[in-house]
Amino acid sequence: MTIKQGDKVQVIAGSYKGEITEVLKVIRKSNSLILKNINIKNKHVKPKKEGEVGQIKQFEAPIHRSNVMLYDEESQIRSRSKFIISQDGKKVRVLKKLVKN
């Protein structure tokens, strides 16, 4: 998966389409991501002990990685990514729209 924790992404599908946010967590097993302030759900929690009050907790639910694209803030472009080998021999991840073949 080419999207990593801390990357800036743009949501390209769903009710949050067009939103630009940060990746908080990557779930490789299900190919999904948890994004900051995106796909917020409510969970109703029952009281566990006597005298305790029930709660409604909000959490960020995962979104599939096919619904987001990497985003570059400097050029304000979203794009897929690829890996190239730099002149000093390191493997570097770059956006396809920003690099010429």
Swiss-Prot record:
Gene3D superfamilies: 2.30.30.30. Pfam families: KOW (PF00467), ribosomal_L24 (PF17136). GO terms for molecular function: rRNA binding; structural constituent of ribosome. GO terms for cellular component: chloroplast; ribonucleoprotein complex; ribosome. Coiled coil: none annotated. GO terms for biological process: translation. It is found in: Plastid, Chloroplast. InterPro entries: KOW, Rib_uL2_dom2, Ribosomal_uL24, Ribosomal_uL24_KOW, Translation_prot_SH3-like_sf. The keyword Disulfide bond does not apply. Keywords: Chloroplast, Plastid, Ribonucleoprotein, Ribosomal protein, RNA-binding, rRNA-binding. Belongs to the universal ribosomal protein uL24 family. Part of the 50S ribosomal subunit. One of two assembly initiator proteins, it binds directly to the 5'-end of the 23S rRNA, where it nucleates assembly of the 50S subunit. NCBIfam families: rplX_bact (TIGR01079). This is Large ribosomal subunit protein uL24c. It comes from Guillardia theta. The lineage of its organism: Eukaryota, Cryptophyceae, Pyrenomonadales, Geminigeraceae, Guillardia.
